[in-house]
Amino acid sequence: MKNLIAELLVKLAEKEEESKELVAQVEALEIVVTALLRHLDPNTQQTLIASVEGALEGVQPESNVPQRDTELLQQYVKKLLRHPRT
């Protein structure tokens, strides 16, 4: 029983480490995208935003992807493009 608990704790620690790495990757990408958007002139920025939003509208998720996941992705992309980090 102790071995099982120890294995579960090790797996939990590994998952937590993976989660931290993913959070760091997402934050790094958010910083890069924000910096890139800020260096574009307003017309180019709006063209890029419209292009990304248009591409998302034209894509249908696979049936096994929960609707909530799709909505979260769309909301986050919109937030990132329209209201980047300050």
From Swiss-Prot:
* Keyword Ribosomal protein found: no
UniProt-listed Pfam families: Anti-adapt_IraP
Q: Which UniProt keywords apply?
A: Coiled coil, Cytoplasm, Stress response
> Between which residues do disulfide bridges form?
none
Tell me the InterPro entries matching this sequence. SigmaS_Anti-adapt_IraP (IPR019732)
Per the record, the domain of life is Bacteria
Q: Please tell me whether the keyword ATP-binding is annotated for this protein.
A: no
Coiled coil located at which positions? 1-36
Name the GO terms of the biological process aspect: cellular response to starvation
Its localization reads:
Cytoplasm
One Gene Ontology CC term in the entry: cytoplasm
Describe its partners and assembly state. Interacts with RssB.
Into which family does the record put it? Belongs to the IraP family.
Q: What does this protein do?
A: Inhibits RpoS proteolysis by regulating RssB activity, thereby increasing the stability of the sigma stress factor RpoS especially during phosphate starvation, but also in stationary phase and during nitrogen starvation. Its effect on RpoS stability is due to its interaction with RssB, which probably blocks the interaction of RssB with RpoS, and the consequent delivery of the RssB-RpoS complex to the ClpXP protein degradation pathway.
By what name is this protein known? Answer: Anti-adapter protein IraP
| Record organism | Cronobacter sakazakii (strain ATCC BAA-894)
Upper classification of the source organism reads: Bacteria, Pseudomonadati, Pseudomonadota, Gammaproteobacteria, Enterobacterales
Gene from which this protein is expressed:
iraP
